[in-house]
């Protein structure tokens, strides 16, 4: 294995540890991982009383919020 390959392997192994360390603030990696976990199709819309309501269970399980895009008429997971 090349030196570059070994360096990449070590960095990948240390990445989870780096996200756990710190002063309790969210790291940029947390936001990235949350964005990757959020599925645009996860919060399916339901119609109640003629209004479109986005279900929030799946988004909330990943720490995100379910939103409704009026222009595109669909629900989506929004991660802070």
From Swiss-Prot:
Q: What does UniProt give as GO cellular component?
A: extracellular region
| Localisation per UniProt entry | Secreted
Q: Does the keyword Cell division apply?
A: no
Which Cys pairs does UniProt list as disulfide-bonded?
A: none
Q: What does the UniProt PTM comment say about this protein?
A: Contains 4 disulfide bonds.
What residues make up the propeptide removed on maturation?
A: 21-36
UniProt GO MF annotations: toxin activity
Written domain comment of the UniProt record: The cysteine framework is XXII (C-C-C-C-C-C-C-C).
Q: Report the protein name in the record.
A: Conotoxin Cl10.1
């Amino acid at each position: 294995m090349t030196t570059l390959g070994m360096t990449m392997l070590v960095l990948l192994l240390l990445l989870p540890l780096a996200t756990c360390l710190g002063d309790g603030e969210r790291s940029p990696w947390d936001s990235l991982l949350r964005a990757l976990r959020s599925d645009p199709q996860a919060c399916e819309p339901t119609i109640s009383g003629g209004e479109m309501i986005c279900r929030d269970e799946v988004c909330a399980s990943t720490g995100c919020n379910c939103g409704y895009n009026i222009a595109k008429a669909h629900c989506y997971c929004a991660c802070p």
